[in-house]
Amino acid sequence: MFPQLFHIGKFFLPTYGLLVSTGVLVGLWISVRNSSKQGINPDDAWNLGVLVVLCGIIGAKILYIVNDWSYYSAHPGDIFSWSTMQAGGVFSGGLIGASVAAVWYIRKHRMPALATWDAFAPGLALGHAIGRVGCLAAGCCYGKPTNHFWGVTFTNPIANLNSYTPLGVPLEPTQLFEAAVELANFIILMWIFKRKKFDGQVLAAYFILYGIARYFLEFIRDDPGRGEVFGGVMTGTQLISIALVITGGLIWWLKSSARAVPAHAQR
């Protein structure tokens, strides 16, 4: 693909960075727009969004390193190398980092927690979809070798250098699969957002939809550092995906059940 969009002398613009940045800006714009419809202060929404992005990047990078700790423990100098910085990260780690930051900020500024999460969930899905196209361009987060007609073949040595991407071999386009999933999730979440019956409904739907999709996508991922757990039964990301589905299901059940209780019964 095209890991580097163009060169000017020694300077180059990484395609991954451009698309991820675009995804972040688009996601933030949608999140702030949704927040204003929920009566949330736009300044608080913007500040929260910036904090979430920064902590999400840190969380994604930390889990990327943890998942490939056998390599990084033997080469600690590579943790802060330019190669590692360009290699992307693990989205579930970013989701955890962003969530921790969001919980802190929302509590500190007394924002309506579930309503805020509902406002941000669709933007997160769309931003992630755009970012995954950047992964395809960079060659990271690639899939297993395949004979299917939709297989993608990487030939740029930069992809191999940064992400160990196999060259000249048709691979499952896991980046495009996940981008399509997240685009569909965005459409579904916006539909729910406009019709939601209780705060937390959009967040719960996102956790369930993304958790299920990511669990199964892990079976065809083949990039190194998958972070296997329980003796290789599943990857760390699959474990996090299961936790997301359970959490989403609990939020939906608890909030919808509370809404169904007659007002006099809640006194």
Model-derived regions, located:
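A feature for loop-to-transmembrane-helix boundaries and adjacent hydrophobic helices
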Residues: 1-267
